[in-house]
């Protein structure tokens, strides 16, 4: 029996098993086996040919956004509207066959937008060009999932399932579980909270399935067996996802209202150029970027060339971005903007910068 057949059998077994106290250990074991087989499936085969166009796109700009969706949902049209890149667009499926990068210039930042080929059902098993598409998506800062509004929620659940099966966790945080394999001493299990989904016996069963017999486990929050398996495997990617429903000009106002109220969702129409500005604002929020402007002594601030950093960046991060030796020569900084009580305020390396702050660095 091949890996795909084993995965299919386990999925069927999970689907037909009733979830209750008596079956939780059995389900936990099945989920651990499923995660193991999926990991094996994603390992590149040694006999795989290296022919064909590659998908590797050099990371450029201040952030990377992956555009994922089924064929013919409007990804290429969206890329052409948002950037100066012409991605071939047509009303038939599979127009885009390789990864096409474009750059959005917004609020002084260069955001790399990748138009990935359409994902078909079964992409995680290697159908279509699914594996390469998903591998590129793992390197992004944010996933924009383009969906056809005329098809309701069918596409969304299928795509979520495909990404989930390859270790991409959308709009979730990393489970707060401490896990450390040891050379001896058996399994040490502790928790700082009341656990309602996992027990010590279930944790031991899952660890034994992975041939781990000595480890230290500490649950700092109430997590599910799936979360614990993610911690053991360790190669999961947790990233924000924005669900974008395109073609809203083809559905009723009631349906538009229903889709717009869903969490992490934006409704647009590329054909009529509707709501694209709001989508850009949401994308900026999800990327959590801040623009910092620099100022030389006795001169006006340079508003033409911003330093783009992650939200919560400190003065030290600004120093490293300007020059790697600047932090060691740092004396103090003067900051103008919303992060200070008065302008200018003299601050140290640990001061947290806000969006559109102006900084002047004084060296020793």
Swiss-Prot record:
Residue stretches making up the TGS domain: 288-363
OBG-type G domain segment(s): 63-288
Gene Ontology terms for molecular function: GTP binding; GTPase activity; metal ion binding; RNA binding
Residues that bind GTP: 69-76, 94-98, 115-118, 246-249, 269-271
Bridged cysteine pairs (disulfide): none
Cellular compartment(s): Nucleus; Cytoplasm
Modified residues ((3S)-3-hydroxylysine): 21
Catalytic activity annotation: GTP + H2O = GDP + phosphate + H(+)
Xref: InterPro entries: Beta-grasp_dom_sf, DRG, G_OBG, GTP-bd, GTP-binding_2, GTP1-OBG_CS, P-loop_NTPase, Small_GTP-bd
Required cofactor(s): Mg(2+)
Family label: Belongs to the TRAFAC class OBG-HflX-like GTPase superfamily. OBG GTPase family.
Task of the protein: Catalyzes the conversion of GTP to GDP through hydrolysis of the gamma-phosphate bond in GTP.
Protein name listed in UniProt: Developmentally-regulated GTP-binding protein 2
Taxonomic placement: Eukaryota, Metazoa, Chordata, Craniata, Vertebrata
Name of the gene encoding the protein in the UniProt record: Drg2
């Amino acid at each position: 029996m091949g890996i795909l057949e084993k995965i299919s059998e386990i999925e069927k077994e999970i689907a037909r098993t009733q979830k209750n106290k008596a079956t939780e250990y059995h389900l936990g074991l099945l989920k651990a086996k499923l995660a193991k087989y999926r990991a094996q499936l994603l390992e590149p085969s040694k006999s795989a040919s290296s022919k064909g166009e590659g998908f590797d796109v050099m990371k450029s700009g201040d952030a990377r956004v992956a555009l994922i969706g089924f064929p013919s949902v409007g990804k290429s049209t969206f890329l052409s509207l948002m950037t100066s890149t012409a991605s071939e667009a047509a009303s038939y499926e599979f127009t885009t066959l390789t990864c096409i990068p474009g750059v959005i210039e917004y609020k002084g930042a260069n955001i790399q937008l990748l138009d990935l080929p359409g994902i078909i059902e079964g992409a995680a098993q290697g159908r279509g060009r699914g594996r390469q598409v998903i591998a590129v998506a793992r390197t992004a800062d944010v996933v924009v999932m383009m969906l056809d509004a005329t098809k309701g929620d069918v596409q969304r659940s299928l795509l979520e399932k495909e990404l989930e099966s390859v270790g991409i966790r959308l709009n979730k945080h990393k489970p707060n579980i401490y896990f450390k394999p040891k050379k001896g001493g058996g399994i040490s299990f502790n928790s700082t909270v009341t656990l309602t989904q996992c027990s010590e016996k279930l944790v031991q069963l899952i660890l034994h399935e992975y041939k781990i017999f000595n480890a230290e486990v500490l649950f700092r929050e109430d997590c599910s067996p799936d979360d614990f398996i993610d911690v053991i495997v360790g190669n999961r990617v947790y990233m924000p996802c924005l669900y974008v429903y395109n073609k809203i000009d083809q559905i009723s106002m009631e349906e538009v209202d229903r889709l717009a109220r869903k969490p992490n969702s934006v409704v647009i129409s590329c054909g009529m150029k509707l709501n694209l500005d709001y989508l850009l604002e949401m994308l900026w929020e999800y990327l959590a970027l801040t623009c910092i402007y620099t100022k030389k002594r006795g001169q006006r601030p340079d508003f033409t060339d911003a330093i783009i950093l992650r939200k919560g960046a400190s003065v030290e991060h600004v120093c490293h971005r300007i020059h790697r030796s600047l932090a060691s020569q740092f004396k103090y900084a003067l900051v103008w903007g919303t992060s200070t009580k008065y302008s200018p305020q003299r601050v140290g390396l640990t001061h947290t910068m806000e969006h559109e702050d102006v900084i002047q660095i004084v060296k020793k």
